[in-house]
């Protein structure tokens, strides 16, 4: 019995306390130029409050998804979203949860959501803009596949009252980004430009607990994640590269394919184990994934974890500038070795 008690870790760190600790560390560092680097870039506490509001929405969404089938939230809502996809019932309710949480915290001035055609301007004095895909992978949710919420945060430009120019900016100007994956457990990955930390929701106490500190992607792993059903529509170089990954030689084993069809689930595995995730352009389009609330946040996380994120041409994702709220891009992101191999292959 004593042995069992000794194995229980009671030195837990919640997301709320982690955010406050990092803010205090920032304040202390800038008073005496000592102390460890921290993740919270703004010492006013406004970003801390915003992150706490986000985690509330993630808890609410996680609870809603767990009960979805029992309370008839599975299926279509009959509404078409900003990108032309027919909304699931869960898309709508989780979008409402997210927007309500952002409007009520007093720190958020602008909201961009996949489910909303236009920019939402909040009646507040907030200094931040939040971009979000409330439920990524919702087309698979009826089958019980893991889905997630992806988010990014910009600080408004100096002197701005809040307009579209505050979000039509390069991804490298985001101050925070992350996602929450809703599966067997709810897993939250967060960065504010200094490391990536992972949290797991303990449903008994209702708190996200720090479980993965300072996450780093493996430099190489022989797994790729891509929808090969579109092979016939890819550029020839891209098709040849994927074929190259599957080649077997005396010196190289073929790569294994792992594709779930939910970006958050596929990327969670890729960040933990390494490898490559890609969603290239099909002929005649500019890609499927949206820059502001899919490509940028994931690229921000991947780079902070030691990986690389580029588009079909090999251009850095975080250097791109979206032309519209729902502008799209191709994307290749993952371990340093795999993405560099792709870049060298297409040159």
Curated annotation (Swiss-Prot):
Any Pfam family hit: FBPase_C
Binding site for substrate: 136-139, 227-230, 258-263, 279, 288-290
Control of this protein's activity: Subject to complex allosteric regulation. The enzyme can assume an active R-state, or an inactive T-state. Intermediate conformations may exist. AMP acts as allosteric inhibitor. AMP binding affects the turnover of bound substrate and not the affinity for substrate.
Binding site for Mg(2+) 2: 114, 133, 135
Named cofactor requirement(s): Mg(2+)
Pathway: Carbohydrate biosynthesis; gluconeogenesis
GO CC entries: cytoplasm; cytosol; nucleus
Lineage: superkingdom: Eukaryota
Keywords: Allosteric enzyme, Carbohydrate metabolism, Hydrolase, Magnesium, Metal-binding
EC number annotated for this UniProt entry: 3.1.3.11
UniProt xrefs under InterPro entries: FBPase_C_dom (IPR044015), FBPase_class-1 (IPR000146), FBPase_N (IPR033391), FBPtase (IPR028343), Fructose_bisphosphatase_AS (IPR020548)
Any one GO biological process: fructose 1,6-bisphosphate metabolic process
Amino acids binding AMP: 19-23, 44-48, 127-128, 155
MF-aspect GO terms: fructose 1,6-bisphosphate 1-phosphatase activity; metal ion binding
PROSITE patterns: FBPASE
Gene3D superfamilies to which the protein is assigned, alphabetical: 3.40.190.80, Fructose-1,6-Bisphosphatase, subunit A, domain 1
Residues that, per the record, bind Mg(2+) 3: 133, 136, 294
Catalysed reactions, as listed in the record: beta-D-fructose 1,6-bisphosphate + H2O = beta-D-fructose 6-phosphate + phosphate
Residue sites binding Mg(2+) 1 per the record: 85, 114
Cofactor descriptive note: Binds 3 Mg(2+) ions per subunit.
Family: Belongs to the FBPase class 1 family.
Subunit record text: Homotetramer.
UniProt protein name: Fructose-1,6-bisphosphatase
Species for this entry: Schizosaccharomyces pombe (strain 972 / ATCC 24843) (Fission yeast)
């Amino acid at each position: 019995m004593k042995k069992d008690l000794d194995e229980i870790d009671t030195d837990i760190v919640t997301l709320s306390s982690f955010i406050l600790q990092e803010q205090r560390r920032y304040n202390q560092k800038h008073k005496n130029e000592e102390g460890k680097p921290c993740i919270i870039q703004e010492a006013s506490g406004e970003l801390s409050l915003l992150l706490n509001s986000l985690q509330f929405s993630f808890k609410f969404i996680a609870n809603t998804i767990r009960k979805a089938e029992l309370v008839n939230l599975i299926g279509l809502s009959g509404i078409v979203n900003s990108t032309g996809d027919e909304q699931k019932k869960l898309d709508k309710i989780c979008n409402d949860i997210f927007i309500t949480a952002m409007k009520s915290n007093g720190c958020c001035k602008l909201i961009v959501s996949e489910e909303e055609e236009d920019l939402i301007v909040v009646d507040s004095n907030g200094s931040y803009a939040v971009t979000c895909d409330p439920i990524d992978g919702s087309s698979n949710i009826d089958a019980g596949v893991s889905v997630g919420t992806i988010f990014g945060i910009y600080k408004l430009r100096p002197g701005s009252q809040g307009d579209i120019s505050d979000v039509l900016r390069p991804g490298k100007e985001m101050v925070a980004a992350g996602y929450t994956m809703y599966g067997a457990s709810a897993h939250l990955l967060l960065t504010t430009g200094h490391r990536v930390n992972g949290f797991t929701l303990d449903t008994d106490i209702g708190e996200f607990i720090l479980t993965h500190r300072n996450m780093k992607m493996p430099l190489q792993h022989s797994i790729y994640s891509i929808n090969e059903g579109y092979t016939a529509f890819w550029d020839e170089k891209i098709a040849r590269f994927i074929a190259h990954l599957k080649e077997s030689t005396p010196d190289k084993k073929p790569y294994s394919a792992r594709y779930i069809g939910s970006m958050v689930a596929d990327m969670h595995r890729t960040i933990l184990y390494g490898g490559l995730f890609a969603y290239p352009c099909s002929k005649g389009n500019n890609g499927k994934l949206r820059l502001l609330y899919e490509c940028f946040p994931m690229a921000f996380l991947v780079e902070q974890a030691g990986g690389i994120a580029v588009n079909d041409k090999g251009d850095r994702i975080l250097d791109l500038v979206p032309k519209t709220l729902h502008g799209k891009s191709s994307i290749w992101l993952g371990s340093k070795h795999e993405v560099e191999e792709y870049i060298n292959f297409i040159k």
